[in-house]
Amino acid sequence: EQVEQGGVNALTELYVRFHKEAETDPALEDEGRLWFKKIEDGDKEAMEIFTWFKEVTLKDTQRVYDLLGVSFDSYAGESFYNDKMAPVVEELREKGLLIESQGAQVVDLEAYGMPPALILRSDGATLYITRDLAAAFYRHNTYHFDKCLYVVAYQQNLHFKQLFKIIELMGHDWYKGMEHVSFGMVSYEGRALSTREGYVVYLEDLLNKAVEKAREIIEEKSPNLPNKDEVARQVGVGAVVYFDLHNDRNKDIDFRWERALNFDGETGPYVQYTHARCCSVLRKAEAFAAAEPDYSVITDDEAQDVLMLISHFPQVVRKAMEQSEPSMITRHTTQLAQAYNKYYFEHRIMDESDPAGTAA
């Protein structure tokens, strides 16, 4: 009942409690490994508990995905590959890549400047890399991908170097299409997050708080604004997403409210406010423009800057795609918003006495 009501929060509390108690009772770690092996072996009781935990987790995370507007074509988790690991392990064995080390099975990567990759524990249980190998083969055989991107924190750099090298050593050249898109860690208001220590900030709580704070700002600045709840949702969620994507992905970032929700600066709300201003101008322009304007009269530096940034946008998007670096787009968008606002404040727009302003 506590898990059903508490969802991911309750499961996290169990996780923290387990590791705290394991510090004084090492036998818990052994019991945990035993139950993990039971899951891999398809034990009925273990699978019932595992499936229940998974359903509770997916139910909670789906609310976050809905808030972010994110959807997935496949929700295949680690357990999906339980019955797909044996053929991969057998191929490693047939190709002479598996060696025994203290009862465990490893792939020796010393020649490539990496420690051995542990494939099977002494009790036969698998590890992350075993499941990732099975997943890689499944994805290649199912999707025949040109690129397979792993968006995972930079702490896993070694893991993915080992993964890709093992697939290469197995003789499969499609490893060349696999890439680890690493990213930095996030701290909250100056404090590092740690699940094991129990200091976590749930994304759903963060997004809801962002919407709440955005609503307060809107009430203060624009009390007569229609659809305040929807605008608050867009501004709040947008602020969190933009804050994350505005930084180079490999840099650690410290999330702070006063920066994320600032309407003046390199933030989501600033860009959204600028977009709203542009839309307002365009609505007024529909009624104002009686004839096709003469664009050749747009010669001032401010307008030229805006036009240049707009023209460069497709190249920026392509470069961001090639380098898997979304901050290129957010930074360019910020620059465009700044350039537009500079033009907006320094020039008259839709003024019949100023053809350049009307054309712009």
Task: Give the predicted meaning of each segment.
Residues 1-360:
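NTP-dependent nucleotidyl-transfer catalytic core
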